[in-house]
Structures are given as C-alpha cells and as structure tokens.
Design a protein with these regions (language model features):
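ABC transporter nucleotide-binding domains
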Residues: 2-4, 9-203
C-alpha cells in the first residue's frame, strides 16, 4: 500500500530526511515516531505528493507518485498537523466544500457526518472555523477525511489538541477502518500514543 525506497529531502545543504525505506501493508496502522524536527511532517508531505523528494521513489496503492499523483491524491486522505480550514466558513460549510471537491453524495455523507459528530461529541458545525479552538478544528478536519473513507489515511500528529476521550475514539475508528481494509500512516512524537494506536512502529 505504501512503499518508499531511498526517500531523501534536502533544503540546500540541510538534509531534512535521509534515505527512508518504508513498506506499509493494507489494513495496517503504522506509527512513525520521532521528536519534533526529526522529519516526520516532511516525510508525510513527500508521501502525499505535496513536496517533491530530492531523491528516492514513492509508491502508493501500487502507483508511482511521479506518474500518477492526481489519481493517488483522490484515493488518499490527509490530516495535517495544523488543520487547514478556511476561517470564514462554518463547520458544515467546510464539510459541504469537501463534498463538492470529491463529488460526494450529500445524503450519504450526511449520515456519516452525523455518526462521526456523535462519536466525537461535536455540536458546533454552525460555528465559524475562526472561532474554533485547535482541538475543535482538529476534530472537524478528521471528520472531513474520515467521512469519505479513503483507501490510505495519512495523519500527522492527530492526537495533538484532542482530549483523552477523543483520542480513544479516534483509535477505535482507525481500528475499524483498518479492519475494513484501509491503511493508516500516523506520525507522533509520543511513544505511548505510537504503542497504543499502531500495529507497527518505525522510529525516525
């Protein structure tokens, strides 16, 4: 599902990521553990096609990122470490915007959104994103990705800003999606989170 060989990223003379080799299987929750500044976010950006590697190869869902990036991006989901939500949109408007991008069925998505909002105990979809706390925006971003059930899910420090109960709910949802065949790649700087939420852990 997720493969990389010799993945390297340099910014001038600075080596941000050096020779990363990954092999993540379908239905696996893979933890990528390391301290802040170790290159976790840079690695995810390369794996998801938002940052071009200096060298190395990436394969997602059996497709080469160099040649089929557009198709790959439609079949994966990404939750960045900083939720990127337009501050002038209300929560439900942001979710409708995501539906329009991916041409999702609104009736079907409404059911999934209600299920996820109930799970995360969210009752603020009529609030402007700019008025939400980091934790609120993080949950909204998670819902916007989880509602469409991507085949591969990339999560960059997903528990930051979440309380213990919400983190537990996220773990249960990820385990459910993995059982259904989805693949999860998750970064964290917390060893306990990596051990509790992952099937395997790699350290950078």
């Amino acid at each position: 599902m997720i493969r990389s060989v010799g993945l390297t990223k340099k910014f001038g003379d600075f080596i941000a990521v050096d020779n990363i080799n990954l092999n993540v299987n379908q239905g696996e929750i893979f933890g990528f553990l390391g301290p802040n500044g170790a290159g976790k976010t840079t690695t995810i950006k390369m794996l998801t096609g938002t940052l071009r590697p200096t060298s190395g190869s990436i394969e997602i869902l059996g497709m080469d990122m160099k040649n089929r990036a557009i198709e790959i991006k439609r079949r994966i989901g990404v939750v960045p470490d900083e939720p990127k939500i337009y501050e002038h949109l209300k929560g439900y408007e942001f979710l409708e915007f995501i539906m329009s991008i991916y041409k999702l069925d609104k009736a079907e998505m409404k059911v999934k959104i209600e299920e996820l909002c109930d799970a995360f105990e969210i009752d603020y979809l009529d609030k402007l994103a700019g008025e939400m706390s980091h934790g609120m925006r993080q949950k909204l971003m998670l819902i916007s990705v989880l509602m469409r059930k991507p085949e591969v899910l990339f999560l960059d420090e997903p528990t930051v800003g979440l309380d213990a109960k919400s983190a537990k709910i996220l773990k249960e949802l990820l385990m459910k999606y993995a059982r259904e065949g989805a693949t999860v790649f998750m970064t964290t700087h917390i060893l306990e989170i990596a051990e509790k939420m992952s099937d395997r852990v790699a350290i950078i």
